């Protein structure tokens, strides 16, 4: 069941929470004897909205809102069965989205 590579993509709106989760994954993988390439920071996606402050008049009074989505990527090589087992047992915070792909 030995694969060549596992690619993990993490997304979050809070970069501190994201970096903490990446650090936890890297420590777990290194403890099991596998090696990690990364974390690789991916481009941050930004969404912006401009909203009028008043109900119908005063066009010049506007409010700006922005939300940023931070992303990181990890590649795990030299995978062992203990690595896969320990990755499945990791509990990550609620604000972090994780996507795992195995490549053979």
From Swiss-Prot:
Cellular component, GO annotation: ribonucleoprotein complex; ribosome
Keyword hit for rRNA-binding: no
Family the entry assigns: Belongs to the universal ribosomal protein uS10 family.
Organism of provenance: Hydrogenobaculum sp. (strain Y04AAS1)
Described purpose of this protein according to its UniProt entry: Involved in the binding of tRNA to the ribosomes.
Primary gene name: rpsJ
Assembly and binders: Part of the 30S ribosomal subunit.
Domain of life the protein comes from: Bacteria
InterPro entries: Ribosomal_uS10, Ribosomal_uS10_CS, Ribosomal_uS10_dom, Ribosomal_uS10_dom_sf
GO biological process entries: translation
Protein name according to UniProt: Small ribosomal subunit protein uS10
GO MF assignments: structural constituent of ribosome; tRNA binding
Keywords of this entry: Ribonucleoprotein, Ribosomal protein
């Amino acid at each position: 069941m030995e694969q060549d590579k596992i690619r993990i993509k993490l997304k979050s709106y809070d970069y501190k929470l994201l970096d903490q989760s990446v650090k936890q994954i890297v420590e777990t993988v290194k403890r099991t004897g596998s090696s990690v390439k990364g974390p690789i920071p991916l481009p941050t996606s930004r969404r912006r909205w401009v909203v009028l402050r008043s109900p119908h008049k005063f066009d010049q009074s506007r409010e700006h809102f922005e939300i940023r989505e931070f992303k990181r990527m990890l590649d795990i090589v030299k995978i062992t069965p203990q690595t896969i087992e320990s990755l499945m047992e990791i509990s990550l915070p609620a604000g972090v989205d994780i996507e795992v792909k195995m490549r053979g």
